[in-house]
From Swiss-Prot:
Subunit structure: Oligomer.
Record topological domains on the Cytoplasmic side: 1-35, 79-88, 128-177
This protein's encoding gene: YOP1
UniProt lineage: Eukaryota, Fungi, Dikarya, Ascomycota, Saccharomycotina
Family the UniProt entry places it in: Belongs to the DP1 family.
Name of this protein: Protein YOP1
Function comment: Required to generate and maintain the structure of the tubular endoplasmic reticulum network and the vacuole. Induces high curvature in membranes and causes membrane tubule formation. Involved in membrane/vesicle trafficking.
Keyword Mitochondrion included in the entry's annotation: no
Amino acid sequence: MADVISSLQTQLKELDTKFAGNNVLNQLEQRTNLPKSYLVVGSTIFYLLLIFINVGGIGEILGNFAGFVIPAYYSILALKTTTTKDDTQLLTYWIVFSFLNVIEFWSKALLYIIPFYWFLKTIFLLYIALPQTGGATMIYNRFISPLTDKYILGPKKTDGVQQSVKEASRATGAATH
């Protein structure tokens, strides 16, 4: 138990250090006499609680907001880099995010079948959005890549075979239909 408390205290100190230059959090810290880490963690818990409770449908807008803002921030940073590793992560995220939004639009029954849908969706989106988790890469390798290879890239292979057959038939004088 002491290890858990020590680990939490270390992580809270890291949060305080990370947000040391944030003017808004510095002002809130001065007014409330609470460390920045407590303010960040408390705000995050409150935000997720609002999504979980979903009073008046607020869970939908808050979940989609979190699912958009954090990856949009990372996307803007990725545009400034020269590597493609972060690009693949983010493109995969945006594919999954768009897919979920299309399904939600056409299947409102899904929202009633799955309890706490907006909360679960938000947790899932955060899992695949944050580069530290590698969630988008896992989703891409396990689900998106096999589907795209089979249904999108598959016909191009047969188109190449058909083209080869046509060229061979022209060369030999055989008729094709």
